[in-house]
């Protein structure tokens, strides 16, 4: 039996070199040590990243390396980082090594899985093209999500990314009675904290597992936290045969942390200073997010675009993997239309008559055509006013304004601060409503009736009330 105890020979920030006498730990193997910080015992995990020769390894620390000195003992575990999986993880917050950090009861998990896993083989992958109904009108109609697909959620600060994420978690929990996993990758601690309490208030916490690797943590933790969350989601898919929703906020920070790790390990950087392995790292993560014949993982990934440059290598490496994009627009939020999804910028591979059907496709393209025409006419309206438009254009503008308002909808998770009860709208109801609007069935109804309602029947009810007033 080889001696699995090694000694620290060098510490460079989050990178630690360890020397073993007669044992060589494998790449990605977890090494453990106990540290005393302010009279508290802390389990520090180091992950092997490179072999330096002569039984020496270079490792990345999953926590702060304050207090480490040369000569300290490190124990090899003989395995990679393992995290708890199964229904026990729901409603709890985890760090990268699978320890709970919500100060709750000790975790009673029966099963632990390694965070480094292979993507499912080709023969197990499902090739069905199916829509994932979210209950959010603008998404289901114009840029539908693929079941087991990947969607990028693009938006600046304060346009409602987190609210959409919470609404999706709510709708999955109640309509599909499914589970969700949320991985906060390089998140602000405050946002993670807010999300936890908001979920608690809106009663969705017991259907979701939260994994946080915040901004203040070393790059190892910020990079690997995405794998921790994904492993929990994979268990629900493979062992329980469920359709899981996986949220990653923010996928850019995953690439960013990888770049930091790469530089610390002394690798030569590639374009814009990113790691030379950016595409393969991203591919390894994204290939695990897929549908199998047992279940599916549908992922929604928030994408931060540095300096609004879509050609930056990090966001560009994400684009290749996405099936749909949901773009949030501040101009729409300023009009008071929530969710502030841009109906003309958001795209989906699923919006194809062979997948969604002829009717859905025609209605969606019709809605986009009317909104595009309205956008083109806005300059004329701003300079000359509505009166200068032809009768046909006036009608287009009126319909477009109604469509714009009908694309808004009250959210369940926003009930607390809007006072309006949330609405889940099925795909059939969504198509029926917009089809009627395009055909001119509702031309005599005031546009105020379409604002913040669910299906078309509610808009007609609201119109009756407005008339009565």
From Swiss-Prot:
Give EC number(s), comma-separated: 7.1.2.2
Topological relation to the membrane, as annotated:
Peripheral membrane protein
Q: Listed GO molecular functions? A: ATP binding; ATP hydrolysis activity; proton-transporting ATP synthase activity, rotational mechanism
Which InterPro entries is this protein grouped with?
AAA+_ATPase, ATP-synt_VA_C, ATP_synth_F1_bsu, ATPase_a/bsu_AS, ATPase_alpha/beta_chains, ATPase_F1/V1/A1_a/bsu_N, ATPase_F1/V1/A1_a/bsu_N_sf, ATPase_F1/V1/A1_a/bsu_nucl-bd
Query: What UniProt keywords are attached to this protein's entry?
Result: ATP synthesis, ATP-binding, Cell inner membrane, Cell membrane, CF(1), Hydrogen ion transport, Ion transport, Membrane, Nucleotide-binding, Translocase, Transport
**Where in the cell does this protein reside?**
Cell inner membrane
Where, by residue number, does ATP bind? 155-162
| UniProt GO cellular component terms | plasma membrane; proton-transporting ATP synthase complex
Provide an example Pfam family for this protein.
Answer: ATP-synt_ab
Q: Which PROSITE patterns match?
A: ATPASE_ALPHA_BETA
Reactions catalysed, as given in the entry:
ATP + H2O + 4 H(+)(in) = ADP + phosphate + 5 H(+)(out)
In which family does this protein belong, per the annotation? Belongs to the ATPase alpha/beta chains family.
Its biological purpose is as follows:
Produces ATP from ADP in the presence of a proton gradient across the membrane. The catalytic sites are hosted primarily by the beta subunits.
What NCBIfam families would the database entry show? Answer: atpD (TIGR01039)
Assembly and partners are described as:
F-type ATPases have 2 components, CF(1) - the catalytic core - and CF(0) - the membrane proton channel. CF(1) has five subunits: alpha(3), beta(3), gamma(1), delta(1), epsilon(1). CF(0) has three main subunits: a(1), b(2) and c(9-12). The alpha and beta chains form an alternating ring which encloses part of the gamma chain. CF(1) is attached to CF(0) by a central stalk formed by the gamma and epsilon chains, while a peripheral stalk is formed by the delta and b chains.
Name this protein carries in UniProt? ATP synthase subunit beta
Organism field: Nitratiruptor sp. (strain SB155-2)
The coding gene here is atpD
